Amino acid sequence: MPIRLHIFVSSARHAINSSALICRFIAFHLSPLLIHLSYFLIIDVLGFVALVVLRPSNHKYNPRYIDMFFLSTSAVTVTGLATTQMEDLSSSQIAVLTLLMFLGSEMFLSFLGLVLESSKQNKHDPENRRVSSVTVCEQSHLEEAIPQTPSMNSTDIKRSCHKYLVFVVLAYMIIILVTGSLLVFMYIAHVSSARDVLTRKSINKALFSISVTVSSFTNGGLLPTNESMAVFSSNNGLLLLLIGQILAGSTLLPMFLRLVIWALRGLRLAKAEEPDFMMNNSSSVGFSHLLPNLQTIFLAAVEVAFVGMTVILFCCLNWDSAVFAGLTSLQKITNALFMAVSARQAGENSIDCSLVAPAALVLFMVMMYTPSLTKLFSACQDHKQIGPESDDRTSKGKPFLKTMAFSPLAFNTTVIMLVCITERRSISTDPLNFSTFNIIFEVISAYGNIGLSTGYSCSRQLQHQDGIACHEKPYSFSGWWSEPGKLILVLAMLYGRLNSKDSTSARTR
């Protein structure tokens, strides 16, 4: 038995070392675009296989392969669109989707980028691994040289900052996820209205707490409930908890990172050089989410102002409509705040988007299409750091995939046209549900990796097919599309995720 155990341990160690060597070779020799594409496709396929192998909780439900592949892609690209009823899935399938959202999140990929960059610096740093020469000196010279300690140069500080950032980002993710899950679980345990919803739906409280926290922090948007957060529209405390988690993983991440670094410097948990250098020279560190102090303050102020204006506009357009039916004034404001924050990143909805005023839907669509201020600031900082001469060299040496890639506007226009072609029969027979606006809204939501959807309503059908009853299905509008239409939307989700990642990867590669 010990011999077999030794053989197993040796084989496992050899497999891990081989995998590490392969990953390092891929990371150091392939372009970032191909690395990201390969990563998303591999995780997507593995998630699809896991979802197919695991059986749903509803034994009468037999999911189609296209729906499982769509769901896996939606989780990996942190989009949040669903073509199946989430409550039909088993707890193990929900756990797989939660893991996929975490592995595909911007935060985790940024963490991997820091780890690879730190490994690359150690690999190309021969000074730390060998002595170039040995000089023989006299005893008097040696005694004079002993008390002298050379100071760290800029390269050493940057290398040390990368290692320090790996620890900071890892600790940040663990703290937010663990604390967020515990707070959500405690809220559900003490508030009967929220607890009764999960009991009625037979959803495990611990699994829901972890899943909703990961979904909010990673901006994934997939929740174990069919109605997303709409069933908790009256629970102000839960919505406010998730608002904080969404902001901590998206637009206010640069501010929270600087606060964590500032707190660690105050607690003296590291040398003074690393936190001071990162706080004063954040652009030199090369981490896209660590912005200079002035830009971080401006980002937080603009985000607060933008969310505030969105809440005011949303309330003015929908205050007395069916969107807020049965809610108090405080609950209406809380739901408007949740939608203003979620429509920018997470895609979790606490209200029925099909009932929202058209002007507010147009605003949501613009918010989903435009990149966040964090990405814009990162791109501007990247342009200043690279310079025009490097831009000319980069443009001349662009890979073929980048040269031939569609612009976002051209790509989305093409996708909308293709979807209109594949769904032309439904457009002619069911024009209210399959309206051009609803199709555009769904495509923009997929491209922006948000996940908001207008859904489908049987009450809007103009023609009822004989012998076929229409049943309300609480999932995304794309769940009613044909298989070619779903595959086209899968491409839109992947393209949007790659376009978003490629635009912010320059500083971390």
From Swiss-Prot:
Keyword Protein biosynthesis: no
Reactions the enzyme catalyzes: K(+)(in) = K(+)(out); Mg(2+)(in) = Mg(2+)(out); Ca(2+)(in) = Ca(2+)(out)
Membrane-related topology note: Multi-pass membrane protein
InterPro entries registered for this protein in UniProt: Cat_transpt, TrkH_K-transport
Subcellular location: Cell membrane
Cytoplasmic compartment residues: 1-32, 117-164, 258-296, 374-400, 497-509
Alphabetized Pfam families for the sequence: TrkH (PF02386)
Keywords from the named record: Cell membrane, Ion transport, Membrane, Transmembrane, Transmembrane helix, Transport
GO MF terms held by the record: monoatomic cation transmembrane transporter activity; potassium ion transmembrane transporter activity
Tissue expression remark: Expressed in spikelets, leaf blades, leaf sheaths, internodes, nodes, the base of stems and roots.
One cellular component (GO) term of this entry: plasma membrane
Sequence intervals crossing the membrane: 33-53, 96-116, 165-185, 237-257, 297-317, 353-373, 401-421, 476-496
GO biological process terms held by the UniProt record: potassium ion transmembrane transport
Domain notes: HKT transporters are proposed to contain 4 pore-forming regions enclosed by transmembrane segments with each containing a potassium channel-like selectivity filter motif.
Stated family: Belongs to the TrkH potassium transport family. HKT (TC 2.A.38.3) subfamily.
Biological function: High-affinity potassium transporter that does not show potassium-sodium cotransport. Potassium transport seems to be independent of sodium. Mediates transport of the divalent cations magnesium and calcium in the absence of competing potassium ions. Selectivity for potassium is dominant over divalent cations, and magnesium and calcium transport may be small and may depend on competing potassium concentrations.
Protein name: Cation transporter HKT2;4
Gene name, Swiss-Prot/TrEMBL: HKT2;4
